[in-house]
Amino acid sequence: MSKVTHQPKIGFVSLGCPKNLVDSERILTELRTEGYDVVPSYDDADMVIVNTCGFIDSAVQESLEAIGEALNENGKVIVTGCLGAKEDQIREVHPKVLEITGPHSYEQVLEHVHHYVPKPKHNPFLSLVPEQGVKLTPRHYAYLKISEGCNHRCTFCIIPSMRGDLVSRPIGDVLSEAKRLVDAGVKEILVISQDTSAYGVDVKHRTGFYNGEPVKTSMVSLCEQLSKLGIWTRLHYVYPYPHVDDVIPLMAEGKILPYLDIPLQHASPRILKLMKRPGSVDRQLARIKQWREICPELTLRSTFIVGFPGETEEDFQMLLDFLKEARLDRVGCFKYSPVEGADANALPDQVPEEVKEERWNRFMQLQQQISAERLQEKVGKEILVIIDEVDDEGAIGRSMADAPEIDGAVYLNGESNVKPGDIVRVKVEHADEYDLWGSRV
């Protein structure tokens, strides 16, 4: 145990997805509540916590490099997060790490911090933590994590082995957190989990309570309640269950944003079966058509994998044909990468790297054309934009169709009479394949 005579300082490195970011926020909130200072440099810190990602091999490598940098620069390091579930792999590369915990092991992380850097004596009234906790996002938007883990066993994914099966947060707790965020000035809530549409499945959608009123633990009920807060609500990681159809009318009514992040992964029934994903492409196309009829303003985001083991040119062509017909607004594409522990590693007919690269390029070229055409349809129209930043050149914001960091932006050149978090009406004047330009109305 170190002898710390000053106000103890903790360095923090957060890697990976928004779900990991929320875990980091929770740990930082507890540390600040206990009187620890959180510092931005290794030099000033008595210890460094690295919250890791282990989803794909490149993320594992990034996490191991971050741990190594923290050890070199500081020497005292605690590791947590998804890669922490693979302690042997970390110890093999970095045996000097003090402690290692898996994901969502908040209490263990704090216990380890207390052991090496004892809790300070502090006046809680002099180190007040905001009621909404420490946030790593800008003040006007926040991620709202509604569950942990996943019940699916997709062959390319190891999340269940690291984060376990689905565990839904009580709906009263989720809604109370959302209310605290709104009271603190948040204008946009991004609902996240490993599987947002499965919310409540593990508790058989039991009835919970919020403000003394009964509320069903389900995605649809959650959306209905969040709509009463008067902010933008955006849904991410929505597995395409049949009941997803039930949230589309809420979007059409303006209760939640007309935005659906629904990872489809592929469009060949054979490849989807190998992935252990839903395989009826025709049914999915029919649903997309129906959703757009109900909510014409709907923005659809999805992710796909090319070069999955066994993928033939015919399978890939099915994927391109799907893109042409579905005309999705926002699309991410990944070249299949083996992940240690994933069932897909054992599948035959691995696709050569040069073929993956060639297919990825063809995929992106087609989707960029589709995205550009979709955005071109907005030129001349008026849209609502939430402002993210303002500088000497103007303002940058996002439309209802744009999630932070992963989607496009709306540029308001020369606009300075706004501030982050403002929601303004903008006339779109120009578009490319990702972004829009316009002027405030």
From Swiss-Prot:
Which Gene Ontology molecular-function terms are recorded?
A: 4 iron, 4 sulfur cluster binding; aspartic acid methylthiotransferase activity; metal ion binding; protein methylthiotransferase activity
Alphabetized Pfam families for the sequence? Radical_SAM, TRAM_2, UPF0004
- Its biological purpose: Catalyzes the methylthiolation of an aspartic acid residue of ribosomal protein uS12.
Query: Main localization of the protein?
Result: cytoplasm
Amino acids binding [4Fe-4S] cluster 2: C150, C154, C157
The name of this protein is: Ribosomal protein uS12 methylthiotransferase RimO
> What does the UniProt keyword field contain?
4Fe-4S, Cytoplasm, Iron, Iron-sulfur, Metal-binding, S-adenosyl-L-methionine, Transferase
Q: Which InterPro entries match?
A: Elp3/MiaA/NifB-like_rSAM, Methylthiotransferase, Methylthiotransferase_CS, Methylthiotransferase_N, Methylthiotransferase_N_sf, NA-bd_OB-fold, Ribosomal_uS12_MeSTrfase_RimO, rSAM
Source organism per entry reads Escherichia fergusonii (strain ATCC 35469 / DSM 13698 / CCUG 18766 / IAM 14443 / JCM 21226 / LMG 7866 / NBRC 102419 / NCTC 12128 / CDC 0568-73)
Would you say which domain of life the source belongs to?
Bacteria
Q: Which family does it belong to?
A: Belongs to the methylthiotransferase family. RimO subfamily.
Catalytic activity from the UniProt record: L-aspartate(89)-[ribosomal protein uS12]-hydrogen + (sulfur carrier)-SH + AH2 + 2 S-adenosyl-L-methionine = 3-methylsulfanyl-L-aspartate(89)-[ribosomal protein uS12]-hydrogen + (sulfur carrier)-H + 5'-deoxyadenosine + L-methionine + A + S-adenosyl-L-homocysteine + 2 H(+)
Q: Which part of the chain is the Radical SAM core domain?
A: 136-373
Task: Give one GO biological process term.
Answer: tRNA modification
What SUPFAM superfamilies does the record tag this protein with?
Answer: Radical SAM enzymes
Query: Where does the chain bind [4Fe-4S] cluster 1?
Result: C17, C53, C82
Q: What is its EC number?
A: 2.8.4.4
Might you report a single GO cellular component term? cytosol
Which part of the chain is the TRAM domain? 376-441
Q: Identify the coding gene.
A: rimO
Domain (MTTase N-terminal) ranges? 8-118
Q: Which cofactor does it need?
A: [4Fe-4S] cluster
- Subcellular location field: Cytoplasm
Q: How is the cofactor bound?
A: Binds 2 [4Fe-4S] clusters. One cluster is coordinated with 3 cysteines and an exchangeable S-adenosyl-L-methionine.
